[in-house]
From Swiss-Prot:
The keyword Cytoplasm applies. This is Trigger factor. The lineage of its organism: Bacteria, Pseudomonadati, Pseudomonadota, Alphaproteobacteria, Hyphomicrobiales. Involved in protein export. Acts as a chaperone by maintaining the newly synthesized protein in an open conformation. Functions as a peptidyl-prolyl cis-trans isomerase. It comes from the Bacteria. Residues 439-460 have a biased composition (Basic and acidic residues). The keyword Cell cycle applies. GO terms for cellular component: cytoplasm.
Length: 469
């Protein structure tokens, strides 16, 4: 096998490989000799099939297997000999020639790939970060407890006109151009006015109605409504108001806490405090991580493989366009041209790829490992995100090894961040919740995404009971 480097520019490599016809012929003869005692053919005793007859019958198929074996093994051995790590699977280009299968021509193919850049990991002594600490205000706990217990609020029938906060019981029939549509009708549906449970414009037209009223309201489904056949359509709903109920005073006590499954109000407050502290902790973690990544980004400026850059950019760009589509917005609405947006997101892609390589190198040198238990926990976390589909999602991961492999990257990254936290200087700083949240919003931890229009995912009526909390 003759191996010749034909390109070495930056990270790009091209290698030409020539396997002489003589070497192929020798390999084929080995295969034929190895199989002559194993093949049974009518008219021949075992082991007595003439070599030329075997070659005529199986020569091309054997040679095809030999070539596949070479293509499978050669890239790995060549890269090992060259002490190179490819950024992606090498591209293999083959010179097709029918004579090769007959053993009458050299087998020529080439490898095209990019190597991972070589760089030295710098010391971390100079990296200093601020860890913000914010105490949970009692007022925030009070407000969250009230939201939780609002599901226990009772309602009492009232006379007179409805107002925001009241629960209205209605029958409704939706129509498109005068024709009822599927899923557009319900009876004894209950709606708390002001809950934004329905599409924009629906609830507002049920303020100032009384029991016994009938009316027809006109609404327009959002352009990005989840039911495609309704998206952007004008519709009318024939409404019959059957009852108006006013909210009773919300009781915040041990009995109310028991209704949501906790033994006391004090225990409920403990749970709520823990949830809020966990939310703060996630924000603090992201801000710490951002500071570390910013510091690493400033430390390294090596060339990155174009193939990895294109993959990362295409993933980001697809997500950006998907977000814009879901939000019913365009680049012009965001005050930026598509060309400028592409440039900005390409810079982000470069940062992500470079930092990914740096974190990977740090993790390798620190011998960061991912245990099977950690991987299983990550799979179960994914499964829990799809209630009602747990079995299907679990089967997906069982049958898709690459999906499980994709879960390794974020786990590995977080473990590398933990390793760095043990090596850098951290200064705690007490801040208010407002300061914590304000800086979190402004820090742009990921690329900015278009804001979604409020209420675009609401459906007309879903429940027969008042929506609580």
């Amino acid at each position: 096998m003759q191996v010749t480097e034909t390109l070495n520019e930056g990270l790009k490599r091209e290698i030409k490989i020539v396997v002489p016809a003589k070497a192929l012929e020798e390999k084929l003869n080995e295969w034929l000799d190895d199989t002559k005692d194993k093949i049974k053919l009518n008219g021949f005793r075992p082991g007595k099939v003439p070599a030329e007859y075997l070659r005529k019958m199986y020569g091309k198929s054997f040679m095809a297997e030999i070539l596949n074996e070479i293509i499978s093994d050669a890239p790995r051995s060549i890269l090992a000999d060259r002490n190179e790590r490819p950024a992606m699977q090498p591209q293999i280009d083959i010179d097709e020639d029918e004579k090769i299968l007959d053993g009458r021509a050299d087998f020529v193919f080439s490898l095209k790939y990019e190597v991972l850049p070589k760089f030295e990991i710098k010391d971390f002594d100079h990296i200093e970060i601020i860890r913000e600490i914010a105490a949970v205000p009692e007022k925030e706990i009070d407000e969250q407890v009230e939201r939780v217990l609002s599901s226990t609020r009772s309602y009492s029938l009232k006379e007179g006109l409805s107002e925001e906060g009241d629960c209205v019981t209605i029958d409704y029939l939706g129509k498109l151009e005068g024709v009822p549509f599927e899923g557009g009708a319900d009876s004894d549906a209950q709606l708390i006015l002001g809950s934004k449970q329905f599409i924009p414009g629906f609830e507002e037209q049920l303020v100032d109605v009384k029991a016994g009223d009938t009316k027809t309201i006109s609404v327009k489904f959002p352009d990005n409504y989840s039911a495609v056949h309704l998206a952007g359509r004008d519709a009318e709903f024939d409404i019959t108001v059957k009852a108006i109920s006013k909210p009773d005073e919300l009781k915040i006590d041990d009995e109310a806490a028991k209704k949501v499954g906790l033994e006391s109000l004090e225990r409920l407050r403990e749970v709520v405090r823990g949830q809020i502290e966990s939310q703060y902790g996630s924000i603090i973690r992201q801000k710490i991580k951002r500071q570390i990544l910013d510091a690493l980004d400033a430390d390294y400026n090596f060339e990155i493989p174009e193939g990895l850059l294109e993959i990362e950019f295409n993933n980001i760009w697809a997500q950006v366009n998907d977000d814009l589509k879901k939000a019913g917005r365009s680049f012009e609405d965001e005050g930026v041209t598509e060309k400028h947006a592409r440039e900005e997101y390409r810079v982000l892609a470069q940062r992500r790829v470079r930092l990914g390589l740096v974190l990977s190198e740090i993790g390798m040198k620190a011998d960061v490992k991912i245990s099977e238990d950690e991987l299983k926990a990550a799979v179960f976390d994914q499964v829990r995100q799809y209630p009602g589909q747990e079995k299907e999602i679990m089967n997906f991961f069982r049958n898709t090894p690459e999906a499980v492999a994709n879960l390794r990257a974020p786990i590995f990254e977080e473990k590398v961040i933990d390793h760095l936290l043990s090596r850098i200087k951290i200064t705690d700083k007490e801040v208010t919740v407002e300061e914590l949240m304000k800086e979190y919003d402004e820090s742009d931890l990921t690329e900015k995404k278009p804001e979604k229009k409020k209420g675009v995912e609401k459906t007309p009526i879903r429940k027969k009971a008042p929506k609580k909390g």
